[in-house]
Amino acid sequence: EIIELTGAPEGQNRIGVLSLPSFYADMEGGDRRCAKDVKKILERMNKENVDGLVIDLRSNGGGSLEEVRLMTGFFTGNGPVVQIKDTRGNVDIKSAHNRQKLFNGPIVVLINKLSASASEILAAALQDYGRAVIVGDDSTFGKGSVQQPVDIGQYLPFFAARDRAGLLKVTTQKFYRVAGGSTQLKGVESDIQLPTATAAFELGEDILDYAMPYDQITPCTNYKKDSSITAMLPALKEASAKRVEKDRDLQIAREDIAMMKQRIKDNKLSLNKKTREQENSTLEERRKSINKERKGRFAEMAKEDATKYKIYRLTLDDVNAKELPLADPDKDNEQFMHLAEDPTAELDDSPEYPSGLDPELREGINIVQDMLKLESSGK
């Protein structure tokens, strides 16, 4: 999507949103590749004079290392992307070979605890180069290792049932950032934290009993960090914190997180029927109260959005269009998301977020706006 802010000055008024559910690649040598598709989107964004960008990596579980290597270069230009150490201690540096950046504007990367593997490589590289502000959960998943499937059958006697022996996934390598730290256990830590739906749950490598430890190796020497974001961060954090305190949906998220953490900590449920019915009734009343309040508030937000934003759809089907169509979240979801009928869907009366912009995405857009303003003022 491209979001045009109708009240903002030129040079600060067009923000792109790039949603990446995975770093996909056609393993059979086909033409569908994440980096190739993203390049088309970014080229069209440049044509549309997009000033800043939100890259949404929430719940992106990873994918092709080659695709993330290529894609990182779109934002950093030529230079190292990730270091990979094998069991013998040999370090292989994977680099991008772009002569120049494809996108030069300020970037916010949205992450959560389910952003893992290749997502962490991209987020870490953009953070180490000083190209992006990382926003979301306190950190990503923390999967900094590489597994190789091994056919157990090849080690069995000749007359054994090899075809039914199965596969064993063996850890053979470990990822390291260009700055030297591993993404293992720690993941990529956010520059600005937001209360999110995944924050209440114990997710990540660090909760596993036998997870590999975090460690560091020698940083790459042939990369240069842009210090401008470091200088901006105090102002960005302060502005974001003020908005979060006033954002009703993010406050509801905070309340939900606190309630869920307490339930997990208590680790018990009453077996008394009346007690359980009362607990369920209390939760249901809270849900209904929140939804009722949201319906009225979302209607007002939708009216405000209509005067504040123009949202243009930008998919692979639109990259060569003469003019980009205006986005219609309901219609676009019907067209592009062909889902099996969900018999329980009608039981959920939670209203949809106005303009298809959830609270974290809205705050990501706000932070990009702040970055553009600070750049413009020279601070």
Please give the residue ranges for each predicted region:
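Cleft-lining beta-strand/loop regions that shape enzyme active-site pockets
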Residues: E1-L156, K174, Y353, L357-L361, ...
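A general structural signal for short secondary-structure boundary/capping elements
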Residues: R99-K101, P157-A160, D215-N222
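Polar, glycine-rich mid-to-C-terminal structural blocks
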Residues: A118, G130, V135-L203
